Every structure is written in C-alpha cells, then in structure tokens.
C-alpha cells in the first residue's frame, strides 16, 4: 500500500483500525501496523496527526512483543511438559508425536 497518496486523517484512521484489530487475537495486524507506519511516525517531518500515529505504532510494538513473549513461553512449556501432563497433554495436542509419552 502506498501511504504517500492517502491523506493524513485517513492514515490515522487506518493506523488506529490496525491497532484495535490486534486486540481480536490478530497480532499480525500489529506487525503490519509497525511495518507500514514506522516511517510515518518517526521519520517524516512533523504534522498534526503524527503524535497519535506514533502512539499507535509504539502500542502496537508493545502488544506484539508481549504476544510473542507469551506465545513463546507457552510453546516452550507445552513442548517440555506435554508428556508429563499425560491425558491432558494429549487432549491439548492436535497430533500426538511418536516417542515417549
């Protein structure tokens, strides 16, 4: 998407929609928000909507970082303890890997 052609008010609206969309368990939207609007928020000359866009980009980065930390922690714990959890670990698995269980 070419953000050069979009008016600043619409950029702010789009940035806000992607930020709020990330709360619907769609952290990929936060990543897209960061990638698309980083230049607008931090590298372009100042304009009226820029502080709000900067705020949404920072909050998106924080949300994405938190989401990645929680997901990484869960994956690590699940992979390490799945076999010890017995039936509950099997119930939570989509596929049961071969090996010790």
Curated annotation (Swiss-Prot):
Q: Where in the cell is it found?
A: Endoplasmic reticulum membrane; Golgi apparatus, Golgi stack membrane; Cell membrane; Membrane
GO cellular component terms, alphabetically, are: endoplasmic reticulum membrane; gamma-secretase complex; Golgi cisterna membrane; membrane
Mind listing the UniProt keywords for this protein, alphabetically?
Cell membrane, Endoplasmic reticulum, Golgi apparatus, Membrane, Notch signaling pathway, Transmembrane, Transmembrane helix
Instruction: List the ranges whose topology is Cytoplasmic.
Output: 1-17, 37-57
Regions crossing the membrane: 58-78
A GO BP term, please? amyloid-beta formation
Tell me the domain of life: Eukaryota
This protein's membrane topology, according to the annotation, is: Multi-pass membrane protein
Q: Which residues lie on this side of the membrane: Lumenal?
A: 79-101
Report intramembrane spans: 18-36
InterPro entries (UniProt xref) = Gamma_Secretase_Asp_P_PEN2 (IPR019379)
Q: Which family does it belong to?
A: Belongs to the PEN-2 family.
Give the quaternary structure.
Answer: The functional gamma-secretase complex is composed of at least four polypeptides: a presenilin homodimer (psen1 or psen2), nicastrin (ncstn), aph1 (aph1a or aph1b) and psenen.
Function summary? Essential subunit of the gamma-secretase complex, an endoprotease complex that catalyzes the intramembrane cleavage of integral membrane proteins such as Notch receptors and APP (amyloid-beta precursor protein). The gamma-secretase complex plays a role in Notch and Wnt signaling cascades and regulation of downstream processes via its role in processing key regulatory proteins.
Q: What is this protein called?
A: Gamma-secretase subunit PEN-2
């Amino acid at each position: 998407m070419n953000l050069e052609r979009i008016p600043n008010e619409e950029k702010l609206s789009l940035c806000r929609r992607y930020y709020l969309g990330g709360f619907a368990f769609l952290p990929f939207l936060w990543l897209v928000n960061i990638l698309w609007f980083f230049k607008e928020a931090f590298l372009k000359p100042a304009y009226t909507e820029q502080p709000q866009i900067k705020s949404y980009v920072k909050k998106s980065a924080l949300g994405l970082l938190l989401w990645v930390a929680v997901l990484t922690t869960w994956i690590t714990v699940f992979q390490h303890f799945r076999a010890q959890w017995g039936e509950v670990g099997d119930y939570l698995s989509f596929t049961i890997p071969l090996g010790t269980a």
